[in-house]
Amino acid sequence: MMKCLLIATGERVPTWVAQGFAEYHKRLSYWLPLELVEIEPSLRGKNHDPQQAIEDEGRRVMAALPKQPYAVTLDVKGKSLNSEQLAKRMEHWRGLGRNLVFLIGGPEGHSQEVLNISNERWSLGPLTLPHMLVRLIVVEQLYRAATILTNHPYHRGK
């Protein structure tokens, strides 16, 4: 079975985000075991260099990657998918036989190094979302995609 990681920059999330993530993580584990890897964010303050923070976080993300992963980067410039399209992508990813990694960056996004290793870029749409909330949305959408593939009634669709 392939290994699936969600590598997210940021360690302290609100309790309600952690609880929501835990619920969908538990539900998803039946179809797709997912491991959350939290990356320590770079310090930010009024004198911080955002580019340096991006590069530092990028190095930590790269160090956390398994060998030869299929990397799906959450990126505002990525491709937006509806739930059915995501289910088809999930089916494709499962058939690759490679470790699957979803990458969530920090407040300023991903380093160029991380973007360069990405096999796909996925956008959650044009809304600006708190990066801590993205992990909850991603795990819920992966669960929804799994239920679509198995005709589970969670996704009522069209």
Curated annotation (Swiss-Prot):
Highest rank taxon of the organism: Bacteria
Example GO molecular function: rRNA (pseudouridine-N3-)-methyltransferase activity
EC nos: 2.1.1.177
UniProt cross-references to Gene3D superfamilies, sorted A to Z: 3.40.1280.10
Entry GO terms, CC: cytoplasm
Residues the record lists as binding S-adenosyl-L-methionine: 74, 105, 124-129
Enzyme class (EC, first level): transferase
Cellular compartments annotated: Cytoplasm
Entry keyword annotation includes Methyltransferase: yes
Catalytic function, reaction form: pseudouridine(1915) in 23S rRNA + S-adenosyl-L-methionine = N(3)-methylpseudouridine(1915) in 23S rRNA + S-adenosyl-L-homocysteine + H(+)
Pfam family, one: SPOUT_MTase
Leader peptide range in chain numbering: none
Keyword terms, alphabetized: Cytoplasm, Methyltransferase, rRNA processing, S-adenosyl-L-methionine, Transferase
UniProt family annotation: Belongs to the RNA methyltransferase RlmH family.
Subunit text: Homodimer.
Function summary: Specifically methylates the pseudouridine at position 1915 (m3Psi1915) in 23S rRNA.
Designated name of the protein: Ribosomal RNA large subunit methyltransferase H
